[in-house]
Amino acid sequence: MDLTAVALLVSLVSVSLSAENAGGKARSCTDVRQFYSGKGFTLNGVPQSEISGEHLRICPQGYTCCTSAMEETLSNLSRREFEGLVREAGRSIQALLNAQYRTFDTYFLELLNGSERWLEEAFVAALGELYRLNAGVFRDLYAELHRYYSGASLNLEEALDEFWMKLLERLLKASDPETASLLSDDFLDCASKQTETLRPFGDAPRELKAKLVRAFIAARAFVQGLNAAGEIVRKVSQVPLSPECNRAIMKLVYCPHCRGLGSVKPCINYCKNVMKGCLANQADLDTEWQSLIETMLQVASSFGAEPSMDTVIYSIPVRISEAVLAMQENMEIYTSKVFKACGDRGEEGTPSSISEEPKKKERTVTALEYKPSPKSAARLEVQVTDVYSKLKEMQLYWIQLPSALCSGKTASSTTGDKCWNGITKASYLPEVMGDGLANQINNPEVEIDITKPDRTIRQQIMLLKIMSNRLKNALEGNDVDFQDTSDDFSGSGSGMCADHLCVRGRPPVFGPKTDRPKLYATGPENKRVKGSGNQIQPSFILLIVFFVSLLLRR
């Protein structure tokens, strides 16, 4: 059969489809007018009964109740609603991340502040005025710990070493206050260099550093991970819908109304294909997003492992008390060795009058001991369990988003041919596409140029990789410097409440017993998508094949 015959058949079928209502009386547009005014639009120019639809650019060109102006208005509305729902879905995830950030941050700072209070109370009771005169050394230590946890660019190991050096200097001067002013800077510098060999504080500095540095690295990495995840969700959720994808959303949502089928819900697989096409770039976040969440789950689990987080934080006063006690008990031996190594000369070369038999102090420090209470252990367990469950809920967010946005707005799978398939009320035959950009090459609803991924989303995928690697380093106890991404993750919690859009107390989008977001969300930026308004549907193809087979029999 020649091409002319095929073209003639296609034309005949098209005419028959567009004239399906020609034989009968034009239907009333009362329902469409009521729907349109319910959306807040004026009824000026809205037809009273169906008109020919050759003017339509998105919806099927059969008899319709929509003018060109109505189609454009509803198309713009579908875009706003879709983008709004994706942002709302993103805000619910941001709210979950923000809640976890606030809960953990509160818990951690309570531990740190409680540790500082305990040290001060114990040392004031033990040393009285001597502690008050030197309290700045201890306060400086805790201030540095706060700064490090908050993201300051400092080396925590060096900060701890600096603390021990200052403490050594103060204890040396306190051992004989009458001659303390005669100790030269050179002598004190020499004395500090002897600590590695003489170990005046015993094993306390080494034991504190080993556990404390690892715990703080993990805690800082964890809150930065929560912050980074929230910021990535915010940026991706704001990627605008492309014009071509807007056509597919309009066809899915409002074209049924123009056809007089406003009560007919979209076929579920039809909706999924539109969503998977429009959110293809977003779905490509899945691999790295899951990797980030999995690593954060490992970090969260480490907080409850021995030694637990609270034990490590409260070990600061314990180790300091052990160190001071060791120094007091061995002061005579230590000063003797220091004078032997560093000389006994004071400032400006004058002989030091420091006694080689330091005076024994009446007041001394007792070694502290921390025993976690059952209440403290239970709170930590609840903290870890809650973090674990909430992060698990959002692990599949990006690939669940298309189905979540279709949930509740589509016909059930048992309705068969009683759903909107993009053309009319009938069954939907195409298979559901896979997730991600590469799987949309044969999407019947949204044809995407898979060679042009969205730039903004690709940048966020790279940031997810960077963040995951940093968290993995933190698990190994390796220090993590977040300052080089301060432009992307600025300040604590910057990704959680952007533009005052924090959602307080909102249930999660995904996971058990949650309300799914309503229909339709945002499409990727700069991607080439072609609408499916002119595509030949399966039922149409079957009709053509039927006519062709008849001709071939001639």
UniProtKB/Swiss-Prot annotation:
| S-S bridge residues | C29-C65, C59-C255, C66-C258, C190-C342, C245-C278, C267-C419, C271-C406
Molecular-function GO term, any one: fibroblast growth factor binding
Lineage, top-rank taxon, reads Eukaryota
Renumbered to this chain, the signal peptide range is: 1-18
GO cellular component terms given for this protein = cell surface; extracellular region; plasma membrane; side of membrane; synapse
Annotated localization: Cell membrane
**InterPro entries per the record?**
Glypican (IPR001863), Glypican_CS (IPR019803)
List this protein's GO terms for biological process. Answer: cell migration; common bile duct development; intrahepatic bile duct development; negative regulation of fibroblast growth factor receptor signaling pathway; regulation of protein localization to membrane
* Residues with glycosylation annotation: S490, S492, S494
As for membrane topology, the entry says: Lipid-anchor; GPI-anchor
Q: How is it modified after translation?
A: O-glycosylated with heparan sulfate side chains.
Query: What's in the keyword line of the UniProt record?
Result: Cell membrane, Disulfide bond, Glycoprotein, GPI-anchor, Heparan sulfate, Lipoprotein, Membrane, Proteoglycan, Secreted, Signal
Its function, per the record, reads: Cell surface proteoglycan that bears heparan sulfate.
Task: Give the UniProt family note.
Answer: Belongs to the glypican family.
Q: What is this protein called?
A: Glypican-1
Q: What organism does the UniProt record list as the source?
A: Danio rerio (Zebrafish)
Which lineage do the record's taxonomy fields give for this organism? Eukaryota, Metazoa, Chordata, Craniata, Vertebrata
Question: What gene name is listed for this protein?
Answer: gpc1
